[in-house]
Structures are given as structure tokens and as C-alpha cells.
Curated annotation (Swiss-Prot):
Mg(2+) binds at residues 24, 26, 84. Binds 1 Mg(2+) ion per subunit. The lineage of its organism: Eukaryota, Metazoa, Ecdysozoa, Arthropoda, Chelicerata. This is Dermonecrotic toxin SdSicTox-betaIIB1bxi. It comes from Sicarius cf. damarensis (strain GJB-2008). The active site is at residues 4, 40. GO terms for molecular function: lyase activity; metal ion binding; phosphoric diester hydrolase activity; toxin activity. It comes from the Eukaryota. GO terms for biological process: killing of cells of another organism; lipid catabolic process. Belongs to the arthropod phospholipase D family. Class II subfamily. Its main location: secreted. It catalyses: an N-(acyl)-sphingosylphosphocholine = an N-(acyl)-sphingosyl-1,3-cyclic phosphate + choline; an N-(acyl)-sphingosylphosphoethanolamine = an N-(acyl)-sphingosyl-1,3-cyclic phosphate + ethanolamine; a 1-acyl-sn-glycero-3-phosphocholine = a 1-acyl-sn-glycero-2,3-cyclic phosphate + choline; a 1-acyl-sn-glycero-3-phosphoethanolamine = a 1-acyl-sn-glycero-2,3-cyclic phosphate + ethanolamine. One of its GO terms (cellular component) is extracellular region.
Length: 273
């Protein structure tokens, strides 16, 4: 269960207390591709404040503590951090610079170049395939600085509802055949059909298809849509209301089929039910 738009530091505990075991936050860049703040901006989801924010490096310092065992702030349930990268607000020519910058800030403030025991997995949410140079830069940077092993903790996800074969082609260009999630969804204000979601799930379940390991639906607020997504077999949901998802998961239809992922589960492995 991914808590959606958790951009203020005080919201982290708020969403974890509602039952989320993953959080998504938005990263806003300046015109040169430097990550500045966690901030969504207007417009955003119905019934949500769009303007909450924090300085990105301060957010990382806090979330490092929340995901470090034995730290006073540690919350065991938080296993995945989804970085919603607002690359559509900057020139595609700056995507590589942005990837370098985000990777360096994670190296310095989250992983602390080997001195941190923070353990969450990282999911890079890329809005459009045209920004794929961000991924190349993000993977190059730890490698160039002697910390390539951190790339094992990082997954890729394209969030713009683009053609799945087009996404596969870009992953092929990048040489990525593992650690790939696929999102499908729309703002909670609008309805969305299931055609593309079903296609993504079908590809995930195709033997030998290495370009989708997990599929999640976003942003779900109505229990009926949560049930619909679970019946289709999604691996996760993003929601403004994690507590509602928890209630649905406890229903007789789902209680024996689904459980919340823990740190012992590998987010890059296909689940074989």
C-alpha cells in the first residue's frame, strides 16, 4: 500500500499510521535539473492539499532515520520509497543532470556513502519515456563513485500510461531487464478503465517477459475500485487513504489472497501465487 503525495516530513508518520508500507513523494527541480523540494503543486488529487513541501535533502535525512533499524524514529513497516520525479517540468535535455543530482543526494543523505544502515528500496517514477536519460545518469553515478551495489536497491517505473511496448523498447535501449515496476492510473478525481492495466498484468505473467516484475494501480480512493484492482491481481495500490485499503484487504474475499509486503519480500521478484 503506497501512501500518495507524502511531501511534508510530518506526513510520513501520518500515512504510516494509516497503514501504508510504502510512500510516494514528489521531487521538484529547478530549470537546471537540480532537485530542490518535495512538492506536487496545483492541481493535484481531489480532497488533498497540493502545496505541502520540504527541502529534498532534509526529507531524505528524515526518511533515512525512519528506515534505519534501532533509530528512535524507525518504522519497520516502511519498505519502499517511490520518488515521483517531476521531470515534465524541465527540459528533456536536463534529464541526465537531474539523474546525477538525485543519485548524489541519495548517496550523501540517504545511503551516506556506506555509513548509513537505512534499508528501504527505492522506486524511480519517471513520467515519460523521453526522459530515460535520467535513469542512465542515476545508474551511472553510484557506479562512477564506487557504490554500484546501491543500484540493486533501485527499481524503475514509468508512470505516464504510455504504450507498454514503447516502454519495453526504452528499457531495452538502457539494458534494463530486471527491477521494473509498471504503474497504471489516473488522478483520484477521474474514472479510468482497466484495459491497459490488464495488458500490463498479462505481460507481467508471461513467462520470460523481463520488463514488468510488479504492477500497481493509482490513485485509488473508492473501495469499489480497490476491490476491482485486487480481483485483477495487482501487486500494489497507491492511495490517499491507506486505511481504506487495509479494510478491503481484511474482507473475506481478499484476506487469504493478499498480505502487506515486509522487508523480507523482494520487490523485484515476480510473485508466484
Amino acid at each position: 500500500i503506497m501512501g500518495h503525495m507524502v511531501n511534508a516530513i510530518e506526513q510520513v508518520d501520518e500515512f504510516l499510521n494509516l497503514g501504508a508500507n510504502a510512500i510516494e513523494f514528489d521531487i521538484d527541480f529547478d530549470k537546471d535539473g537540480i532537485a530542490q523540494i518535495t512538492h506536487h503543486g496545483i492541481p493535484c488529487d481531489c480532497g488533498r492539499k497540493c502545496t505541502k513541501k520540504a527541502i529534498f535533502t532534509e526529507y531524505l535525512d528524515n526518511i533515512r532515520q525512519v528506515t534505519t533499524p534501532d533509530d528512535p524514529k524507525f518504522r519497520e513497516q516502511l519498505v519502499l520509497l517511490a520518488l515521483d520525479l517531476k521531470l515534465q517540468r524541465i527540459s528533456s535535455a536536463k534529464a541526465y543532470r537531474a539523474g546525477e543530482d538525485v543519485a548524489k543526494k541519495l548517496l550523501d543523505h540517504y545511503w551516506q556513502r556506506g555509513n548509513s544502515r537505512a534499508r528501504a528500496y527505492i522506486l524511480l517514477n519517471i513520467p515519460l519515456v523521453e526522459d530515460y536519460e535520467f535513469i542512465r545518469a542515476f545508474k551511472d553515478t553510484p557506479k562512477n563513485e564506487g557504490y554500484e551495489s546501491y543500484n540493486d536497491k533501485v527499481g524503475i517505473n514509468f508512470t505516464g500510461n504510455e504504450d507498454l511496448d514503447k516502454i519495453r523498447d526504452v528499457l531495452e535501449i538502457l539494458g534494463i531487464h530486471k527491477q521494473v515496476w509498471q504503474a497504471d492510473g489516473i488522478t483520484s478525481c477521474l474514472a479510468r478503465g482497466t484495459e491497459r492495466l490488464k495488458e500490463a498484468l498479462e505481460k507481467r505473467d508471461t513467462p520470460g517477459y523481463n520488463y514488468i516484475n510488479k504492477v500497481y494501480a493509482w490513485t485509488l480512493v473508492r473501495k469499489s475500485i480497490m476491490r476491482r484492482s485486487l480481483r485483477l491481481g495487482v501487486d500494489g495500490v497507491m492511495s490517499n487513504n491507506p486505511d481504506r485499503v487495509i479494510k478491503v484487504l481484511k474482507e473475506k474475499e481478499f484476506a487469504d489472497k493478499f498480505r502487506l509486503a515486509t522487508y523480507n519480500d523482494n520487490p523485484w521478484e515476480k510473485f508466484r501465487g
